[in-house]
């Protein structure tokens, strides 16, 4: 049965999953990359960049789990790019270049419709402007027997969790405090939403917590 998951989502000790002032130069916001220091050295992440080498320990195991087994992805518009408002043209095709790491249908939430973009490696970006539930329906259909990943950003994850749509959440808590940014957990009563901890794995760079219903 298809499950909807949040996976590999970095969070600071004070609950922020992105920094302030996202821009082309700072796609994760100011200091936002600090919550993902656990993933950058892994073999899985380096392969996503087309590079060799990388670490193969516990962090890599979680990084691999965060990308494998998914038949469709859902992204908020910020996860696709820094452009705001109407699309000025068709030039911007995502943060990852011509061959994004999704390799599956990827549904981008937006208020502004845009034709699908077919990329190298099996990724096609579909732009959904009629709500999170319609996007999830499309993603489930596209995923077939595989799972659907809610890839972020912060507000997109919060909306799907609050709507009761997410079966499993993997958070990687970084040992740093951002002080400010986009809060992931503020106002979310995970216990009331039915989540319990099913996995808890500390590493040198993060503490991996997996919650499930």
Regions found by a protein language model. Give the residues of each.
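Enzymes that bind and transform nitrogen-containing heteroaromatic metabolites
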Residues: 1-213
